[in-house]
Amino acid sequence: TLWNTITDYNRLAAFIPDMVSSRIISSPGTPKRVEQIADAGLFAFIMPDRVVLAMEEQPGQSLRFRAVSGKVASMSGEWRIVGDRAPVTLYYYAHVLPLTPLPPLVSDYFIESEVRTRFEAVGNEAERRMR
């Protein structure tokens, strides 16, 4: 299902481009923390190449996240699933504030491109799992 795809934290790197690793680093029974490492290449100054996210899950409905450490000034967002049966709609919102301020045209273009690529990868993986 879509929910299982977006919360498959330990396998996200298997289907999201440029994500080197993603793993739960918190202990069972504590608030969920996920460390993600990406290969941002030349754009590491825009997108964090390492971040630890605090996850807040509302199973089957929404997943909120915020950076608690890493190479980013601020990062937060949400995945939201609307609909109980197919077709469902997946919404994604994120606010990323890089450590290094850049011209908006540069950072906005790159972030939009990265988000689109990752969003499409999640959608493709969810569809693959439903077959």
Language-model features: locations:
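Alpha-helix N-cap/helix-start motif
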Residues: 15, 44-45, 74, 104
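Beta-strand/loop substructures that line and gate deep hydrophobic ligand-binding cavities in soluble
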Residues: 67-115
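Hydrophobic ligand-binding cavity/cleft-lining segments
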Residues: 1-29
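Glycine-rich portal/gate segments that line the openings of hydrophobic small-molecule binding cavities
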Residues: 23-71, 120-131
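Short intrinsically disordered, low-complexity coil segments enriched in acidic
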Residues: 1-4, 36, 46, 88, ...
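Hydrophobic pocket/interface hotspot
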Residues: 2-5, 12, 55, 92, ...
